[in-house]
Structure formats: structure tokens, C-alpha cells
Amino acid sequence: MPSTGTVRAIHVAPEQGAPTERVDRVRAVAGCGLEGDRYYRADGTFADREGSDVTLIESEALAGVERDYEIDLEPGVHRRNLTTEGIALNHLVDVQFRIGEVVCEGVELCEPCSSLESHLAENGIREALVHRGGLRARILEGATVATGDRVERI
């Protein structure tokens, strides 16, 4: 069970339904989310759900979806904020972890929903992402997150 990894990509969507935008760095604000993202302004599909400050997905999971289901997800279309590599996100539910200087706590798995399925219009995407759709987390201590930052359990 890998307990350290790296941020490989950062995406924010300025409003619900808008395409995600890739950024090199973003400010994470405790209890709010990532500046410039729909959830920061409480505008996302799950804005009323506890622990939707930031979402993460493993690059390894995306590679598995492509391998097992022949679905190639372009960067950011999965609508998760941070793409990581080298850390088992499913093991971070109810665990505090650090992304660079940001302290987070895993809240729940980010299982695929009908909203993602309809947004992508890709047959089988919901099934393909079950148990590998990533992690929802709350931000406990804010700071700037940048591509290349280390992700580690505390």
C-alpha cells in the first residue's frame, strides 16, 4: 500500500458543467476548496456534501480504465481536481494526509455518478470507475498546491 505519491495534474472548473482548466498551481483554502473551482464557490453538483473541498484520482486508475475498458480519458474530463501518482487514494478515507503544505482528510471514495456519465457521454464509464473514481477530501489547513508536490499520509 503506497503511502507517498506526487501531484501530476491540477484541474479546476469555474462553474458547474464548465470544462475543467489545467493549472500549474492553485490556492487551497480550508473548508472551502480550490480557488477558481466550482466547489470553492459552493456551485458544484455535490456542493452540499461534506468533504467536497477537493477531489483526487490516481493516474494508475485512469490507466486501468484505458487498459480494462478501452476508454481513454483526456486530462481533466474525469472532473477530479488533482491527478496523483504513486499513492493508494482508497486507503486515505478517514486519514489525514498532506499535499505539499496543505493538510487534508479523506472523507469518502469519489464513486462515479450519473452526472459524470452524462457529461462524458461515454458508454461504460460509470462501471469502469467503480472503486477507482478517486477520493473526496476536506481541506484542514490551506496553502498552495503545485504540480509535482508530494502527497503523503501524516
What is each PLM-predicted segment?
Residues M1-I154:
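Metal-cofactor-dependent catalytic cores
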